[in-house]
């Protein structure tokens, strides 16, 4: 109703951009005739104009003013370098991002290309732009691919990868535009704030940031803080004993009600992801461990038992984690990707290692932490793009102050979303999924099946193998994950069947008929791998492993093997082309050395050859000619195949379970029907699915009994669909509340973190260190006076002897100070007198230290301040964690836990800063530098 009265606010926003789009289109005619050098000169002219403005605030209006011309320049560069021209809707997307909003753009609408517009414009200020992606592979792909546009226009492009050294990171952060993952950016920020010297700092001040898949980073990952930790030793046998106790305890069939314990030793709340022992369970556990009390502070067991129970019932192998090389590796529940190097905290990971009988690694202590929410709010201007943001619009607005604008598609969507089919049991559902996959496959259409876990993807794989349907499997298992982009490149071919866990292939488009570009690159990689890549790097198979009907996995082709099965490519290459490739391999061995490259170096060279950027390198030119030749032969077949697939109905996407978030369901649907292609989607569900079981409640249980139908009969009911949507909304609200709570609690820490980090940075920069330390001393003198002097009593009754003794504890150089010298002084006079004494003593101390070596006093000041900040901040983080655990119980006493946390946390912070100041003053006066040794003649 409001929309009818006021009009659609999104349409109003889009209308505002239309005149600017017209301006850019008019400028296109002027820019088209310019030479490459003249186009590059535009960048220098823009930079000059912005440099004269000075501050960022003054530069903003100039950026808005030059936007049409800058966008027209990028559009022309895109055509020349990539052979891609920005559509009008992509220009609108660029403007939305430049204004610091979220642009919702559907799959296949070229989000990656859109990011080149605002990143170029904002990089002209010289203050750096960060383009953020969800994984290292996408960051590298975008830096190589889209980075060509920026490099062509004279800007420097940096890339941050997981295994880079600090000096490489600094060099890349100093580029005009830097591509990185969210976790690398966050961890570098934390490491910079733990640096012992300014030369170790790698990042510069933040300015502008564009996040690709913004919902994945700012919402899905917002519950997980970034933590840098150090190891602390805890007894390993406790984890092992707790795991044995957990196995012996029996789970209650249902939750207890009204304070009455259920039958069983412990209850599991899947919704809250918690386990609670019953009275009987406590008694049993204490008896098995031979202890009186699980909560005994001298020998605590409760924490270990709770973690062991959670490991047993809530952390499922091949769903939440996989076991690989003797380690439990976390699987990201949203993307289905493994996250090596990440560990659950508070001893939970150790409990899982004990459950799986793996070596137990040391527990960790937090040294520094920040949530993504507070990290990305450090950018003065933040923008993001995704295919699905509207469902989370409120959260983006409230938490990040980010508006969402839906950018229209370039072509009308032709996808059909078929109604859900709900089955009574899971077995019936999986049979139906397999049958529909077979039917669609036989019609010559490609099928993509999204599953929610590794285990489910393998179950479906077995069902399809029974029916002799060849298919590719894409899940978190290591043998599949490395083939991700290759499998997705094949997924649009006629009759292709791909099973993917949580659509891990976001980032690579599914192109109908197959992606001939990618297949040509794959062919070259296969031909060159054995000749050019170091032998130890050769273990990765160059082609996706395809699961065959009868034989399970095919043999992994080795680098030196003959070309892989032809079924991976659209056609067999002609003899001429095969000979050309063999000759190319021989020539490149002469030029680049026999097996002298790393795999990444080879891939980068093939990627460069596959694009259109100008190059003078004859080897890259030869590689480019060969790639074009292979692509040409593949194209002839792929184009026909694409036509067949289109006529058959395009890609069919099957969802096998509703995800907790509607957004993730929409992302899966969005794989079909990209850029106006035909396509269809359908979800198959069962009444035993997690979402309905955990959040659907008793209502769904009632429905199960009401439907007296055969197992293999699908149920289609409006009431059921509403129950599903209601359950999803309930889950989204539940997780939103958790994220909001994480954010509110971290907001308290954030204010403290900023104060500590800015103090630390001042010290690292070496700005006025002496003044800072004297300031600490003056405040310490004031605190001593306030502690030992009661202003309500007359001065003659003050305990000046105690006061003077305390001052001498901190400043031994004032050993001649006597109580008589301070008698008769008022409170303010006393403070001023002691401050003056401290300053004199500090000058004497400085003279003594500087005699040993000039500049030593400044080094000592920096060392002691950093040492105290780091030690006390680490202890403070532990104390704040403990406080957060305990304040929750105060809700029972009608007190707001958050307000209690804020108040007590603030008091603890003030106490920490006071201790830091006092410790620095004490350390500075006690500092006795060793005399330089005389060299013996």
Curated annotation (Swiss-Prot):
Localisation per UniProt entry:
Cell inner membrane; Cellular thylakoid membrane; Cytoplasm
Keywords per UniProt: ATP-binding, Cell inner membrane, Cell membrane, Cytoplasm, Membrane, Nucleotide-binding, Protein transport, Thylakoid, Translocase, Translocation, Transport
Task: Specify the domain of life of the species encoding this protein.
Answer: Bacteria
Q: Name one GO cellular component term.
A: plasma membrane-derived thylakoid membrane
Query: What InterPro entries does the record point to?
Result: Helicase_ATP-bd (IPR014001), P-loop_NTPase (IPR027417), SecA (IPR000185), SecA_CS (IPR020937), SecA_DEAD (IPR011115), SecA_motor_DEAD (IPR014018), SecA_preprotein_X-link_dom (IPR011130), SecA_SF2_C (IPR044722)
The leader peptide range reads none
The answer, when asked if Transcription is one of the entry's keywords, is no
> Which reaction equation describes what this protein catalyses?
ATP + H2O + cellular proteinSide 1 = ADP + phosphate + cellular proteinSide 2
Which GO terms of type biological process are on file?
intracellular protein transmembrane transport; protein import; protein targeting; protein transport by the Sec complex
Q: Oligomeric state and partners?
A: Monomer and homodimer. Part of the essential Sec protein translocation apparatus which comprises SecA, SecYEG and auxiliary proteins SecDF. Other proteins may also be involved.
What protein family does this chain belong to? Belongs to the SecA family.
Q: Which PANTHER family match?
A: CHLOROPLAST PROTEIN-TRANSPORTING ATPASE, SECA INNER MEMBRANE COMPONENT OF SEC PROTEIN SECRETION SYSTEM
Q: Which NCBIfam families match?
A: secA (TIGR00963)
Q: What is this protein called?
A: Protein translocase subunit SecA
- What organism is listed for this UniProt entry? Parasynechococcus marenigrum (strain WH8102)
Gene it is expressed from: secA
